[in-house]
Every structure is written in structure tokens, then in C-alpha cells.
Amino acid sequence: KMILMPELAEIGLSDIQYNATNGFVTARLPRNSEKEFPTIGFIAHMDTADFEAANVNPLIWEHYAGNDLILDAEAQVMLSPKDFPALKNYIGQTLITTDGKTLLGADDKAGIAEIITALEAIKAADDIEHGDIKVAFGPDEEIGRGADLFDVAGFGCDFAYTMDGGPLGELEYESFNAAQAIVTIRGKNVHPGTAKDTMV
């Protein structure tokens, strides 16, 4: 919140709020037209996966040529199109990777950056009429609880989209719902070869 809220104010958003109950930062780009437009929301998460994420050292690869990317020569860490064929889709583009020692955290810093950049572009383009556009940046997506406390009614959008990675131009319009379960089975720890009628 300490970084996002001032940045949202700097680009001219209003109603910037931090909800201490659910950890979400929300804001609104006010409508610039008297026409009737739906209120659209864009959502991204602030948390990253629970792995090494301190002291991130991004590597920038300009004009990627389709070759192996050596992230850490000493530890023999690399990204290769042999293992990651999708790299070939980005030949000629600039790639940003980790140095192989930590997470990059692009999931979902990239989504936040996309939303803020899009809002800047929309705000700067006087010829794009729009209704209210709302944003929400929240925690706990990586542990599957990000939406548990999200105030959908309070967000007040007709439609909302989550920005969370994927190839340029791809739109996912449905997804699965995942949950975690802990199953405890009480019984005898017996080798499967002799377990018939005795294990449970």
C-alpha cells in the first residue's frame, strides 16, 4: 500500500482507499463522459509465491534472439527454448527474468504494472470516452484466499477482470476453482504387500 497508493494518486485516480480488514487497495478513474457506460474493474494481486523473494536482481535481455538465457553460470541455471518452447514467441522482444537465485515476482507485479499503465494511457487519451474504471490490488492470491474477503458489492462494478499473466492478447473467460483438503486416515501403517484386511 505504501507504494501503490501514492502512485495511484500521482496518475490522478480518486477514492484511493486501503481496507485494513481485507488488505485490498482500491481506487477509481472517474468517468469522463455523460454517456451511459458500464463500470469496469481491473484486479491484480500484490503477493508473490512463498519462495525466496528478497534481494531480487532482475536481468534484462534486449532483442532476445531465441538462444539459451544463462541466468547463473556458476549454478548452471538457464532458460532454454528446449525446456520452455514459448520463449520462441518472444524473439526480438525485451525479456525480464530473475537471476536464478530468487523469484522475479512478476506474478503478479506485471498485472499491477499493466493496469496502472493502461489507466495512464486512458487518462492521457482525451478521445477515449469511458465510465468509471475501478482497480483493486489485494493479497493472498498465492495461498488461494485472495477473494475470500474481497468486497464485491463494495467494489461496485458491472464487470471486472483479473490481470494475472499469460501471453499478449490472451483472455481467459473461465477458470477452475481449486481448494486444499487435509485428509487424516487412522489405521495401521502396514506394508502394502501384506496390508490386506489389516491396514485400515
What is each of the regions a protein language model found here?
Residues 41-45, 136-138, 161-164, 184-186:
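Short beta-strand segments
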Residues 46-48, 83-84, 166-168, 176-179:
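Short glycine-enriched loops at secondary-structure junctions
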Residues 88-176:
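Acidic/histidine-rich catalytic neighborhood of metal-dependent amide-processing enzymes
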Residues 173, 195-200:
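Acidic-enriched catalytic cores of C-N bond-cleaving enzymes acting on peptides and small amides
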Residues 1-94:
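Acidic/His- and Gly-rich active-site-bordering loop/insert found
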Residues 3, 20, 37, 110-113, ...:
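Conserved active-site and cofactor/substrate-binding residues in soluble primary-metabolism enzymes
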Residues 24, 39-41, 132, 158-160, ...:
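Broad gene-expression machinery/nucleic-acid interaction feature
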